[in-house]
Amino acid sequence: MNAELQALKERRSVRKYKADMVPQEMIDQVIDAGLYAASGHGEQDSIIVAVTNKEVRDKLSKMNRAIMGTKSDTFYGAPVVLIVLAPKSNKNAIYDASLIMGNLMQAAHAVGLGSCRINRAKEEFASEEGKQLLKEWGIEGEYEGVGHCILGYADGTVPQAAPRKANRVFYVK
C-alpha cells in the first residue's frame, strides 16, 4: 500500500494530550494543509482561527462543556484549538469546511501531532458570547462554526483503529 493511503488508515483521534505547546512552524504546516482542501467552485471562503492563548482556549473549553453538559475538558488538554468557520452566505461552505477539518487532522498526523475533531462549534459561535469573540478577533460577517480541530502531543499510546463496520459500500455496475 502506498504511503498516503497508509497514513489515511493510521490517523487516530487522540483524547489525551501533554501540556507542551506545539511550535508555531508545525501549527502553520497543519493550517497550510487545511487551506489546500477542495472547495466548491474554488471559493476558498471558509476560515480557520488558530487559538494558542491558554486563557482563550480555556474559555472556549468552558463554553463547549456547557453546551455538552459536562464538567470535563472537551479539548482533552490539547494546547492548540483550530476553529473552522464557514460563511453563512455560501450554502456549500459547510461541506468545504468539513474537508478543511479532514486535511487538518491528516496533516497533524503527518507532522507527528495528535488531533481530534470536537463538535459544538455551531452552537458556540451562534451564541452571543461566541459572536462577541469573533468580533474581538476582527472577524467580520456571518459565520457558522463547523468544528474544532484540537492539536498537541499525544500523552500515551495512540489507540489502534477499530475494525471497520460492514455493509457501508454499495457498488452500482
Model-flagged regions — what are they?
Residues 1-173:
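Acidic, surface-exposed loops and disordered segments
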